[in-house]
């Protein structure tokens, strides 16, 4: 027909390509909206809790994970810091660590590293990060290395060689084990503020350079604190720009050093909190991070799989906001009585695996709910669960399925990136609380 223009073959081809690209981009955008779920695994936990990488497979948790975060690798102290494996026996030498797949380990790589490689073969989507540092780590290595460009470059090169390239020991290689890093420097001081950002930038630059050779995408994240006194020395916007996401503590709002009982992981504050002036909440932390320039999609909210507890607490207000005398004692895991000998070197059988006064695993807490003199109470205003035993004067604060449901709804509503748990092995055998978090993120 006169005046009509018939599409040329090249135009058709281009149009088809654009359609395909459009579909691809939409698919990627849909993937981006899926919430991240991460979980920390303690290297030493196999000794105390008996929790192994194989348990991730047995409980069907592995299939739910975006990231498994292995805690911890060391940054050595001194003038020339380097990365090293904290516990070589647990990491790769112990042949008694249960196999994940049922197949024997390939010598000389045993232990947790051998088990993680088997887990990744069963779950190709799973990415594994090595967390460097930790609460008990010596921060002097971070400080020394971060002060100069040469020091930063040397430390990062050491960490990549050991963990990402997998040169874990002479004659022992663990290729394709770790997909990146979770930096857990607790915590930078005011003098470290710029150096911390520069160190993250060096990690990002060297990982990007490695990508040019391997064509693999490497993940960089850092663990960031809940309380202002700890995050005030981090340039949150600049630091967040260097990483894929932040694991931001959703706990530590109350702890062993407190003089009055409080909630350790509250979502909100409340006007009737008599400790309001010295308290904080997850909501306040989220708002502070976002106001500082951290993208909501990079914010991963932390969930504790443990309880914080005290004793010598008077029978007032369910034990909440009361003066305390001491940390709660270590109990047997079934909650029936005290652990006779909670020494970590040679504990009595059947004790709560944390073996630490002032703490209990969620697994043990479940055995106390409305049992053995304990009465459960839920703070709907602040969104937190508590247990109190009036006769013993013992009080615990923790997360339960109700608080998890509200917190995960908050994550969805505020378009946060997702969530993570500290730490695997503290949930019950079925991973009930962990699975509740996963379900709530959907």
Language-model segments: residues:
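Extracellular low-complexity, Gly/Ser/Thr-rich intrinsically disordered linkers
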Residues: 46, 356-442
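Substrate-binding surface in catalytic domains of secreted glycosidases
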Residues: 81-106, 189-355
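Surface-exposed amphipathic alpha-helices with a cationic face
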Residues: 31-34, 112-129, 133-134, 197-214, ...
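Bacterial N-terminal signal peptides that target proteins for export
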Residues: 3-13
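Conserved, mostly hydrophobic/aromatic
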Residues: 68, 130, 183, 203, ...
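Bacterial N-terminal signal peptides
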Residues: 13-22
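Glycan-recognition patch characteristic of GH18 chitinases/ENGases
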Residues: 30-168, 333-352, 356, 434
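An active-site-proximal structural segment forming one wall of the substrate-binding cleft
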Residues: 148-181, 199-202, 206, 231-242
């Amino acid at each position: 027909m006169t005046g009509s223009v018939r599409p040329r073959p090249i135009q058709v081809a281009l149009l088809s390509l654009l359609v395909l690209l459009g579909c691809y981009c939409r698919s990627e955008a849909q993937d981006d909206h899926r919430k991240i779920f991460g979980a920390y695994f303690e290297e030493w936990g196999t000794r105390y809790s008996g929790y192994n990488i194989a348990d991730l497979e047995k409980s069907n948790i592995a299939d739910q994970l975006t990231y498994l975060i292995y805690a911890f690798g060391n940054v050595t102290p001194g003038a020339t810091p380097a990365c090293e494996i904290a516990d070589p026996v647990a990491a790769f030498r112990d042949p008694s660590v249960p196999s994940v797949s049922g197949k024997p380990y390939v010598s000389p790589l045993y232990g947790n590293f051998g088990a993680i490689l088997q887990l990744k073969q069963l779950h190709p989507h799973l990415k594994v990060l090595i967390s460097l540092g930790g609460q008990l780590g010596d921060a002097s290595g971070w400080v020394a290395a971060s002060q100069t460009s040469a020091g930063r470059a040397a430390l990062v090169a050491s960490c990549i060689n050991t963990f990402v390239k997998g040169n874990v020991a002479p004659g022992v290689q663990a290729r394709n084990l770790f997909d990146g890093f979770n930096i857990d420097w607790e915590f930078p001081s005011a003098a470290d503020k710029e150096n911390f950002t520069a160190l993250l930038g060096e990690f990002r630059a060297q990982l990007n350079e490695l990508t040019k050779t391997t064509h693999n995408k490497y993940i960089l994240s850092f663990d960031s604190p809940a309380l202002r006194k700890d995050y005030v020395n981090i340039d949150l916007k600049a630091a967040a720009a260097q990483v894929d996401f932040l694991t931001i503590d959703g706990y530590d709002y109350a702890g062993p050093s407190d003089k009055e009982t409080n909630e350790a992981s509250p979502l909100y504050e409340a006007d009737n909190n008599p400790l309001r002036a010295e308290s904080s909440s997850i909501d306040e932390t989220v708002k502070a991070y976002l106001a500082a320039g951290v993208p909501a999609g990079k914010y991963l909210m932390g969930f504790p799989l443990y309880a914080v507890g005290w004793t010598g607490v008077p029978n007032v207000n369910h034990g909440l906001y009361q003066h305390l005398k001491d940390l709660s004692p270590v109990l047997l895991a079934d909650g029936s009585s005290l652990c006779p000998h909670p020494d970590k070197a040679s504990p009595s059988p059947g004790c709560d695996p944390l073996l630490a006064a002032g703490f209990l695993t969620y697994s043990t807490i479940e055995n106390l709910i409305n049992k053995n003199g304990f009465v459960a109470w839920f703070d709907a205003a602040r969104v937190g669960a508590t247990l109190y035993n009036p006769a013993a004067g013992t009080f615990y604060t923790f997360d339960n399925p109700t608080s998890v449901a509200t917190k995960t709804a908050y994550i969805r509503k505020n378009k946060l990136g997702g969530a993570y748990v500290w730490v695997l092995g503290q949930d019950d055998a079925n991973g009930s609380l962990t699975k509740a978090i996963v379900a709530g993120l959907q």
